[in-house]
Amino acid sequence: MIEFKQLLVPAACLLMGCMPTQASEKQNYPSVAAMEKLDRGVVALPAAGKGVFISWRMLGTDSKNVCFDVERDGKVIAHHIKATNYTDAKGSASQTYRIITYQEEPKMDAAAQREVSGAVKPWADLYRSLPINRPDGGITPDGKSYSYTPNDCSVGDVDGDGEYELILKWDPTNAHDNSHNGYTGDVILDCYKLDGTQLWRINLGKNIRAGAHYTQFLVYDFDGDGKAELICKTSAGSLDGKGRFVSQAATDAEIRAVDNLADYRNKVGRIMEGPEMLTVFRGLSGEAIHTVWYNPNRAFGVGKQVAEGESLLNGYPQYSSIWGDKDNYGNRGERYLAGVAHLDGLDKNPSAVMCRGYYTRSYLWAVDFDGKELKTKWLHASVSPNDWEVRDAEGKIIREVHGLKNRDPKGNEVSATAFAQGAHSLAVGDVDGDGCDEITYGSAAINNAGTLLYSTGLGHGDALHLSDLDPDRPGLEVFMVHEEYPYGSDLRDARTGEILLYHTDRDDTGRGVAADIDAKYRGCELWSIDVPGVRNIKGDQISLGGFRKHEYGERESYTPGFRWPAMNFRIYWDGDLQEELLANLGRPHFVPYLQKWDGKKAVPLPLSNGKQLYEMGHSASCNWSKATPNLQADLFGDWREEVIYWDESDASHLNIFTTNIPTEYRVPTLMHDHIYRMGVAWQNVAYNQPPHLGYYLPDKAEKMK
């Protein structure tokens, strides 16, 4: 393995002259007016010893001098405190709590304008068990039965009351990876309030295949009315939350005329033909508002058009062999990603960016919703390693660049576009300082106008992390692992693609994480399966361990008893400013537990009752070997994060965990940080990745004192 630092400004970037200013925290922080309207998110649960632990949100809209009163049963028990959590040693489960907020600390002899939260009762335990309505299973055309388990979740405020609702994707037990044949059950989406009330159910039908790479759903307020919508891919037979076919929400006569009883699955359960559509649903009711053709279609066209040399099958674009699949079986062209991006500025309404392909051709389709209709903003197409183009709503090319060249740090010629550069996830944020979001698409980045920002050419990978990983460098950084030769991992400048650290390896580097786990070093630490131990952000190894490889490929322990920190999700959980980790014990159940870095190794971090996550409510992770939570986000309470797992004893409950560890630090809700909020929106996509902040928390907390 080789490690070195090298400046690499990709040729694709140089040719375009794309060198705007560096992004900063300010540029990735929306104005007060643009922040989600959230309530205090007050939560109470058993304290670590006796009593009740209460926590609540500090908002990004609050003044620097904001302070709080804590009320128990209508009586103030803590007066004008600065912290956003409080332990009531005399509290009990029978009592109720409210938070009174003062934007400026009032004088004792003067009345002050104040905001009073709703009253909450303490949870009975360290987690909340949310009942969910498990769908009935079924039998596939080949006679095999299946049932349902809770899979990925997202959040949005669908009714505008300042509290998030949960949108849950139910996966059938026969969901498939794109590389596998087989029928699947229908994909089902539910919406629940945090008290367990079900608002609606959407059934995407038999013509949407179930699997991690197919249904990518976005939950966000796209039209600026203060209420979140849902956007996802649909097809003939998809039913909205009112039980109506989504095709009836179209303004296109051909979409309205689709045969909703047709079954487009082939004899091995794949869907290679038929209508492909995109639908926006009303978040409160699940009602389909508008449905359009999905772009590009299987034959690279817009709507029902096909690219030159492609053809129709039974009236619809036929899956193209140019996607590059062996035997043309519907793999590479059926891999989707999605994200929410503020392409016109953080204070403007966002776009849905729906993506198709990353092993060869890469397409990113930006779509706007004005409250009534979905409209194309642009369609980016990286059609070869050397050529990219941008098309408008009619499919007309409005910008194109050909003949780009690019070389990797070792001098090998590599892709100069987003062709073959995407990952199993993406990231969104203003990386170039222009006030608009860009899309980090694996080893490449796409500008807010749909043009190519840069490409490192280092290829596809399973994981990437965008944040201010190195607070002493201007702008943001990306850490990514790679699946293809020369494999390995890299740390790069998120604006230019300049390679800061680079490791090569002999095999697929399938896991890697960037997180601030060690307070002795500024910035985030890096670890991945191509490098033994843990590195600081400058590339220095700060711990031995992990594994090393013999020339014949077998691995041996590098330090007896050492294991890398978990290569899954980072999380803010305890009271310090470093990040903890979500780990899993492995097969067959992938049971989750908390982990903390002690400076030399990762150690289990039990809950205050001495138990681990998996010992509470039969909690289990999802997505098989990826072993991810159903959702991780700052849902309520103070700035520490919540994590959701499903109850494997009945698959009919979600377990929501929140911390009860006091902290002295006051930090605005993470959901008011733009990069973090965008990360929660794309978290459910493909191989789920954790959300990251757009700033370095220890520095932010110092400013908030």
Positions of PLM-derived features:
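Bacterial N-terminal signal peptides that target proteins for export
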Residues: M1-V9
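Bacterial N-terminal signal peptides
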Residues: V9-G17
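Boundary at the C-terminal end of the N-terminal hydrophobic targeting segment
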Residues: T21-E25
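Beta-propeller-forming repeat regions
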Residues: V32-R40, G49-G51, M58, I81-A83, ...
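Beta-strand/beta-sandwich contexts
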Residues: L45-P46
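Solvent-exposed loop/turn segments flanking beta-strands in beta-repeat/beta-sandwich domains
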Residues: L59-R72
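Short strand-turn-strand beta-turns centered on an Asx-Gly dipeptide
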Residues: R72-I77, N448-A449
